[in-house]
Amino acid sequence: MGLFMIIAILLFQKPTVTEQLKKCWNNYVQGHCRKICRVNEVPEALCENGRYCCLNIKELEACKKITKPSHPKPATLALTLQDYVTIIENFPSLKTQST
């Protein structure tokens, strides 16, 4: 009867924090902390426990395609006629430099 109680207690115990598979990375791509990453996973960073944060390659590529920002168009400089007049007025003429 004592052996049955010991086995029952061991079966119903929850695993400790180190035995559980920890989640890592960010909100968009979830990874798992492992000593060795699987074939379809890539190590991106270190977890708190010194293991690798293994991310699924397909999920990572899909996230990069979605979150890739579009390049902004370069700003164009448009000068008005008044801008040209002020530039010409402030530019020293050749006659004043030669005398």
Swiss-Prot record:
GO terms for cellular component: extracellular region. One of its GO terms (biological process) is defense response to Gram-negative bacterium. Residues 66-99 form a propeptide. The keyword Signal applies. It is found in: Secreted. InterPro entries: Beta-defensin (IPR050544), Beta_defensin_dom (IPR025933). The keyword Signal applies. It holds the Pfam family Defensin_beta_2. Keywords: Antibiotic, Antimicrobial, Cleavage on pair of basic residues, Defensin, Disulfide bond, Secreted, Signal. Residues 1-20 form the signal peptide. Disulfide bonds join C24-C53, C33-C47, C37-C54. Belongs to the beta-defensin family. Has antibacterial activity. This is Beta-defensin 127. It comes from Pan troglodytes (Chimpanzee). The gene is DEFB127.
